[in-house]
Amino acid sequence: MNLQKQQGALVISLDFESHWGVHDRIPLGKYRQNLLGERHVISRLLELFREYNIHTTWATVGFLFAETRDELLSALPTKRPMYANRRLSTYDEIKDIGNDEQEDPLHFAASIIRLIAAAPHQEIGTHTFSHFYCLEKGQDSEMFRADLEAAAAIADKYKISLESLVFPRNQENISYLSICRELGIKAYRGNEHSWVYKAKSREDETLLRRGIRLLDAYLPISGHNCYSAKVLGCSLPLNIPSSRFLRPFSRKLKIFEPLRLRRIRSDLRYAAKNRLIYHLWWHPHNFGKNTNENLTVLKDILEYFSLMRDKYGMESLNMRELSQKHIDRCGLNAH
């Protein structure tokens, strides 16, 4: 496998989940502004990505593909997760949603999905069908298989083939990777290699780890988290680990914003100079509040990436593009 000509690469993946992704964590009343703002944010993100020629993967919850409540109900798999903690189940939320996107824009997004699919260099991947938690008690591999099959079926209506996966809450479960491969997933976003980012169930997560991750956004605690293409290996699905979560702007932490930006610039420069991969991710709803401040930060990052592209030949690749380039180098049969 010849990796000598590999340039540095910026990979961006976005977890597009709307209310399905936060229903068990944040009361709707407290987060409604973020979720309603998400739709406007996505249009502005697409404009920025077009302006800077940024290739992005949008890992989208399958429920959002349904145009109506009836369509969603008809698309549900028969095997569903029976989480020990019932609060985690998105299925229990369906009874309370509206009939369609116009009535309930927090649970339907067909028009947004079409907007993304029509934009240049944007990949629509999967965030599972139901925002499926792969490390929680009460689910198993057959339930996961049924979930991914349902995601593929509803995406097929849009003529979208799902090839990239992001595990909800980053609950990476390596025992499910063979199922991903069987169902056509060629790449997934794994976690950073530091112990503070190791995949955990909600029950096993600790305040200490959360606190260190917060500090890591501002100070170089876990390092650059960039990596060589060799790390991807040569077996499907490829693990394209995250490097950094782009935390949303916080007025309480505003004084530290220069540190956060410097951290990401330093990562980008290191990746560009050393021909490494840098994988940045966030949720569109993170930008639904303080939208202008968040987009100003992102624009600064993309401006700096443009400098790295001009100076070192750094590329912008979505997960599908990176995995396909790597598959070609490895000589893998991806079918």
Predicted regions and their residues:
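Catalytic alpha-helical scaffold of carbohydrate-active enzymes acting on polysaccharides/glycoconjugates
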Residues: 1-164, 169-240, 256-280, 287-335
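Positively charged, amphipathic and often flexible ligand-engagement surfaces
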Residues: 240-246
